Every structure is written in structure tokens, then in C-alpha cells.
Amino acid sequence: MRNIKCGVADIRKRVFAEVAKLAYEGGDYTRIEKLPYEIIPGEIGRQRESVFLERAIVGERIRLAMGLPLRPVTEHSLLSDGVEESAIAEKYYDPPLINVIKYACNACAPTHYEVTNACQGCLARHCQHACPKGAIRTERGQAVIDQNLCIKCGKCKDACSYQAIIKFTRPCQEACGMNAIGQDEYGHACIDYDKCVSCGMCLVNCPFGAIVGERIRLAMGLPLRPVAEHSLLSDGIE
């Protein structure tokens, strides 16, 4: 989230700093393979269950920062693959602008309503009576929502005297004003590029930093170019 210090922003800044440093030092692209180890040192992962997973994710962030596409998860390739084609004087970004690193995604559950342990199993059963679909029943003295029947109207949440029902939202999905975020068969976020306008709201709202964008000029310390004017990607690099 914006204006709040977080680990995602720290990693993002470190990736951009290293890519910018690489460019200003003359572009020794053999160093690219070492960058994930410099950004994530040591033997133990700090943010995720494995240091190898952290480095793999950072590697994809490095590629996107340099204007390179994500690598297929099912194929072996070097981190630097394709860098020669990208390191040219004139280059416009290759779509898509917003990408999902699938193995960085937490596969959050879709937006739904959930009964917490704050439920008192009251006699009034306001939530049950408020539900227009009969999706709420009582089990072991507590309310339970049948997700197959629930239409996510939120009436049960409003009716509960104990605020025991919460709306669980998938941050990226909730932030998208175009309803362009879905999920694949593994529950990972996926973007419908026919709807996506590349606003970046999903990017800044993903707590796991799984959604990233191509930011070649920003990574090199250059300002964004005016949308209404033609300019080269390399303008101002000298």
C-alpha cells in the first residue's frame, strides 16, 4: 500500500537500484546472474519459506525492470536471456505492462464473507434471517456460511450484532476498477488484458509483491515521458 513502509517496497527499490547501477557502470550483463544473490544474501529466506524462492522472484523482477519478459516457469533459461536484444538505443516496452509472477502469488481466496470466532451463537440469529438465499446455518453453536449459496450481498454482516462476520477481499481484485483480475486453476492471480488499462492499482495493493510492471526508465533514474509527446526511451540517459 502507498505511504506505508513495507518489505515489498524495499525489495522493489533494491532491484531498481541494482539495475540502474548496472546500466551506469557500462552494462556488464554477466553480472545479472549474480544480482539475486547480492539482493538476497545468506542461506535463509527472510520473507518467504525459501531463500531460493525469494531469489527466483527477485530474478523475474530484475528482468521486468530491464524491459525483458517473464520466463516460462516450465522451461530452463538464464536470467540474462534476451538482454542483448533489449539493450539497444531505441526500445519501447513489450506488452503487457503489468505482469503477475505466478510463484510469488499467495493464491488468496476470492472475495467472500466469513464467520469469525467472534460469533456468539446468539438466539436472535439476525444473520440467518437477513440472508435472502438461506446460505447460513448453525453448526456447533456458531453460524456457518455456505459459500455455494452465498451471493456476497453483505446483509448478514450488516445484521450481526457482534460484527462477527467479515468481508474477506482479495487485495488485487478489490483494487481493480476494471474487474480484470481473475485466477487460474491453481488459484494464482491472472490478468485479463482485454480489460486491463495498466493503471497499476493491483500492483500497489498486492501484499506479496506478486504483480510487477516494466519500469525501464524509472529503474535507470530517468523521469517518465510525456504521453502526448514522442520521445525515445533513451532520451536523457547521457
Predicted regions and their residues:
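Ferredoxin-type iron-sulfur electron-transfer modules and their immediate structural context
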Residues: 1-175, 179-185, 209, 215-235
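Conserved glycine-bearing catalytic or ligand-binding loops at nucleotide- and phosphate-handling centers
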Residues: 200-209
